[in-house]
Every structure is written in C-alpha cells, then in structure tokens.
Amino acid sequence: SEASLAAANSKKYESAIVGAVEKFSPRLNVKSWGLTTRNVANVVTTAMNAHPEVVYVARYSYLYDQTTGKVVYLKFSYKPNARTEKKQLDAAIAEVNKQINTKNMKPAEIVLAYHEFLTSTVAYDTSGAKEFDPTTGRDHMYDMYGVLVKRSSVCQGYAETMWYFLRKAGVPSGVAT
C-alpha cells in the first residue's frame, strides 16, 4: 500500500528532502519514490518536522503525473533571507555546542545543561499571536532561529530546540503536540 511504502522508506525520504533543502535546491526528483498526491504531504511534513533546524523554507509544492497521480518533483521556495538565516542558525548551534560539552555527562545532566542554557539565555515571547505570513512565517517566534539567534520564542521554539540538542547528544526525547 502507499502508506506502508512511505513508512518503509521514511528515513531515506527524510534524508533526501532535508539534504535538498539544506542545499537550497529548488526541486527534488522523487519520481522513483512512488509518492502520490495522497501521501506526499505526510512524507514532506514528517521529514520537515523531524528537523527543527530547517527554518528557512517558505513553502513546498509538487508536480505530478495527472494520469497516474504519481508525484514527480517536489518544489521548494525559500524565505528571502534564507541563506543568511541558515548561516546565523548554524553559527548559533556551534556556539551552544562550544559552551555545553556533553562528553562525560549522564543523560539527566545533559537535559539539565541544555535546560539551564535555554532558560537563562532566551526570553519568552509575550508579543502575542502574530499574523502568519506564508513567506516569512511568524518572525521565528515558534522555531530554533527565534530561540538561538533572536533569543526570543514561545514554548514551541523552546521544545523543538531542546529536542534537537537532546537527539544530537543521544538522549531519547520527543516533542508532544
């Protein structure tokens, strides 16, 4: 079935999608993946949600064969300042990694170290819900860029940032929505 095919290859798809986006590719050939108009949204959303560090995609779309319903290409559009934001976020992540050395820490110590870092360096964004702009998003109040570069975010940004660092440190964790 389509669902089982997508599930069986989800890590492969995730890697290819995120790899293309990290290179700012405008499109990705997915013809051989067997994606359809019914499962493409789930595959792309799952891949993007697994990578909170990817904050610069404005939207995606797809091209498909109208006869078969099979998706041929994924198309990505990026925020106007995407390359700059990626560089800034990468630098901020590197700075956190410099400040927090998890090498000889137990999992609970790692959680505490990142928690202390985030709660002591990031202000909670109390500006209220902003209008969603499909090109620029919500000024990063919900993501890692808001947390690590702007130093201001709501709970979603904190949670995704914590999840990112804990996964990188090998500490099992997840984000509840």
Residue ranges and their predicted role:
Residues S1-K98:
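Linear, non-domain "peripheral" regions
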Residues K103, E109, Q156-G157, K168:
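Polybasic, low-complexity, intrinsically disordered segments
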Residues R83-V147:
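Secondary-structure boundary elements
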Residues G157-T177:
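Hydrophobic/aromatic-rich core segments of domains that either
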Residues Y73-K75, Y145-G146, G174:
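Ordered hydrophobic segments in well-structured contexts
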Residues H140, V147-V154, Y158:
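Secondary-structure capping and boundary motifs in well-ordered enzyme cores
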